[in-house]
A protein has these predicted regions:
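Alpha/beta-hydrolase
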Residues: 1-8, 12-17, 22-23, 27, ...
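Non-catalytic accessory segments flanking enzyme active sites
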Residues: 14-88, 92, 282, 291-313
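Glycine-rich "HGGG/HGxG" loop immediately N-terminal to the catalytic nucleophile
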Residues: 59-61, 122-124, 133, 137-150, ...
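Short beta-strand element of the alpha/beta-hydrolase
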Residues: 93-101
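The serine-hydrolase catalytic nucleophile loop
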Residues: 102-114
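Conserved hydrolase catalytic core segment
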Residues: 115-122, 166-219
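Alpha/beta-hydrolase active-site loop
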Residues: 147-166
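C-terminal subdomain of alpha/beta-hydrolase-fold enzymes, centered on the catalytic histidine
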Residues: 237-388
Length: 388
């Protein structure tokens, strides 16, 4: 069994100062006026954001917040994997691995972990407690870098070993949005003897036969039309990620603008105001994880890796994920959910919840709604641990 080592995040002072200096020196006078958020990240907001970054943002405070949880490092398949492991309250907390996506990080779940692990501290029942495992994806954040692009299926294999061989869980639940939804799907598909159930708040997988019937075909047409506008970043990162990285690795402002555009465009905002949902500290801390670890490059590799793994099709034979699956359907999800009839052909859907609000970053946007749905799903599993 591989060694598990306690890990404390500490970014050198000189790294923080270098980042601030680069942000402060950005040549704003060379930026043309823009059209709000229509052409990309809003110029006026970007200036305000960077002024806050340089004069008010406190990385040390946010770093300490991450370190409040039990952080660890281990090695799986010769890749260092960083993870938070918060053991739940009570006699029988259910093991739960939560995977982030891009452009997310473990920061998405900082307001989420304690609520899941210790519900009795927040007005809930100890019977709903989870052992919460939140890893940094390979190539992301504080985890090590794979030798070449890894897709979500390979990452699922790594996380399966993390949960079973490293942490010793016989059975566990997997949850995720964005790439975390794909990773959770592969955990349920490839590792059903250990992954007892999955809960997803995005549909990234596709059935080999495509949409059937008028309702599904109409969804597919709307989806493809929307992706003409939304797909630019994905095409770049899935084909030539290295080229983009030369610019981003040299520009903290560039990384911030690239990520902020997605946080703005993929979220359920009030009057288009990004700070109606997120604080500047939340946004900056998520961005800073990419910058201080210099992982913008390798984090984008996952898009290339999925292409090499065969894309979105779950099974060329038309098989589905047979472990019980919970689906939290948020209305402003970037990848609009298809009709349930389509999802039923890919997953054994045990719970389907159409949410009243929320978008792509559900754990940050609507943590209470997502947590309630995860708890309900786990309660309704017939037995725990389920028989393999």
């Amino acid at each position: 069994m591989e060694t598990i080592t306690p890990y404390k995040i500490h970014v050198p002072d000189e790294t923080i100062e270098e980042i601030k200096s680069r942000v402060a020196a950005f040549p704003w006078h060379e930026m043309p006026s823009d059209g709000g958020w229509e052409y990309g990240t809003n110029l006026d907001y970007m200036k305000e954001f960077c002024e806050y970054w340089v004069t008010k943002y406190d990385w040390r405070k946010q770093e300490a917040r991450i370190n409040e949880f039990a952080n660890f490092m281990t090695s799986v398949d010769n890749i260092n994997i960083h993870f938070i492991h918060e053991r739940g309250s009570g006699p029988n907390p259910k093991p739960l691995i939560i995977s982030h996506g891009w452009p997310g990080t473990i920061v998405e779940f900082l307001d989420f972990i304690d609520l899941l692990a210790h519900p009795e501290n927040h007005g809930g029942s100890v019977e709903d407690a989870f052992d919460v495992v939140v890893p940094s994806l390979p190539g992301f954040g504080f985890s090590g870098r794979p030798p070449r692009p890894y897709g979500p299926r390979k990452m699922a294999n790594i996380f399966s070993k993390l949960m079973t061989q490293i942490l010793g869980y016989d059975r566990y639940i997997a949850q995720g949005g964005d790439w975390g939804g794909a990773i959770s799907s592969w955990l349920g598909y490839d590792h059903p003897s250990s992954c007892a159930a999955i809960h997803i708040n995005i549909l990234t997988m596709r059935h080999k036969d495509g949409p059937q019937g008028a309702e599904e075909i109409a969804w597919a047409e709307r989806f493809e039309k929307d992706q003409i506008v939304q797909n630019g970043y994905r095409t770049q990162q899935a084909t030539k990620p290295q080229t983009l990285s030369y610019a981003m690795m040299d520009s903290p402002v560039g990384v911030a603008a690239w990520i902020l555009e997605k946080m703005h465009g993929w979220s359920d905002l009030t009057h288009g105001d990004i700070e109606s949902v997120y604080t500047k500290d939340q946004l900056l801390t998520n961005i800073m994880v990419y910058i201080v670890t210099r992982t913008f490059n390798t984090a984008s590799w996952i898009y290339y890796g999925r292409r090499e793994e065969g894309g979105r099709i779950l099974s060329p034979e038309g098989k589905r994920v047979e472990v019980p699956t919970g689906c939290a359907v948020f209305p402003e999800e970037l990848l609009a959910w298809p009709p349930r009839s389509y999802v039923d052909r890919i997953y054994n859907v045990a719970q389907w919840t159409e949410m009243p609000r929320g978008g792509h970053f559900a754990a940050m946007e609507e943590p209470d709604l997502l947590i309630q749905d995860i708890r309900k799903f786990a309660r309704n599993l017939n037995e725990w641990p389920p028989s393999g």
